[in-house]
Amino acid sequence: MILWNTGNEVSEQYHPELGIARHLTEVVHRYDKTRPVTFGASYPSKSAMNGTELQVDVHGMNYAAGVYGGPDFYGEFLNKEGHEHLSGFSSESSSTMSSRGEYFPRKFHVSSYDLNEPGWGGLPDQEFAALDRYPAICGEFVWTGFDYLGEPTPFNSDKTVLLNHAAAVSKEELKKQEEELKKIEQNRPTSRSSYFGIVDLAGFPKDRYYLYQARWRPDYPMVHILPHWNWEDKNGKNVPVFVYSSGDEVELFLNDRSLGKKFKQPYEYRFRWDSVCYESGELKAIAYKDGKKWAEKHVRTTGKSVKLKLTPDKTVLKSDGEDLIFVRVSILDADGNEVPTAEPLITSSVSGPGMIAATDNGDPTCLIPFHEPKRPAFNGLYLAIVKARRGSEGTLHLCVEADGLGKEEIDIRIQNEGLEKRYLLTD
């Protein structure tokens, strides 16, 4: 824990004379003098300049690099008279939207090329550039790490829906989509979750996860290619290719033919090949850093789905009634490649002293309840969450099956270490 936060999007940011922020800061300091106090201001162009920023130790600014400030707002904040002792950070940034594995998206999905933002948000690149220009700003908290239930912008069908999608889509097309959305909502909602996460609701990383990995871990050799390379309907057509890497240059190959090198320029954070004529086969990206090979990645056109693969995050489960094992289920072709477009109906079951706690697939439009063991994979992935019966021991047997793909099974050892006593903490 590094900061105490006393609020977010608080009304007092417009009225610093009310004194509530100062009072809350003093209360926190009374009990903890070791950690600074902050809050998240949703309108930093006002709150960071009107005295509210002086009521906390560290000023949190939401979307300050975008519409609520601007590309040089952090500089204005840092250089304002009286701010010499202040520090600040981006308490909410970006809010870019995407659906995992969707690039030319189906209805009510958002493209994973990571170029769609709400009108009040921005792209990750925008925040990265502002932080690079003003390194005295401490960093950022991206909205959000995970998708979450509710708030399915841009498909929330409210009065601001036409403002919620700042992509290259005309207002006429959005209006048509809104009218269609109203018809569909007579029978069911369109989405259950947000699209903001860099990780989907099932815990599977989206492409954007790797953009942040490249940014936040420059010492970690990595390269990530998007999109997948299964595009039978796009032979001879343009399919843009993006690469995220912690390297400073990348060379892209299609079926061993070089498509050229790209160099990371100041305030640029993606390597882009916007005009790639699709042909099946293999994409390969080789990243370099300081002139030396840094990382390599391959993406291949896959064959048909033939089997399932189960990957648990661990193999021993405590029987304390709370411990969980998350089993990633992927679909493979005959060569062992994951098929990124496969969406078979998958069923999970257990025998032994345990249960299926939940299943998921990361699809924001899937309304199947979490406790149901049967659901389709979404863009090649399915999740089973397994739990042991309280106080049990022995072995739990998990079976996952899909029509035409057979079944896969794993054994999970249950460890009974005795139930921990739990106490209420009091003064």
What are these regions (language model features)?
Residues 257-259, 341-362, 372, 410-412:
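Short, well-ordered beta-strand segments
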Residues 1-264, 271-292:
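Extended substrate-binding grooves/exosites of carbohydrate-active enzymes
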Residues 263-264, 306-309, 349-365, 418-423:
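Short aromatic-acidic-glycine turn motif
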Residues 278-282, 322-324, 391-395:
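Extracellular Ig-like/FN3 beta-sandwich strand-entry sites
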Residues 272-278, 372-390:
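Short, hydrophobic beta-strand segments
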Residues 288-290, 401-405:
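Beta-strand-rich extracellular modules
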Residues 214-240, 251, 300-326, 332-339, ...:
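Short S/T/G/P-enriched beta-strand
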Residues 241-245, 286, 322-340, 346, ...:
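Beta-strand-rich structural segments
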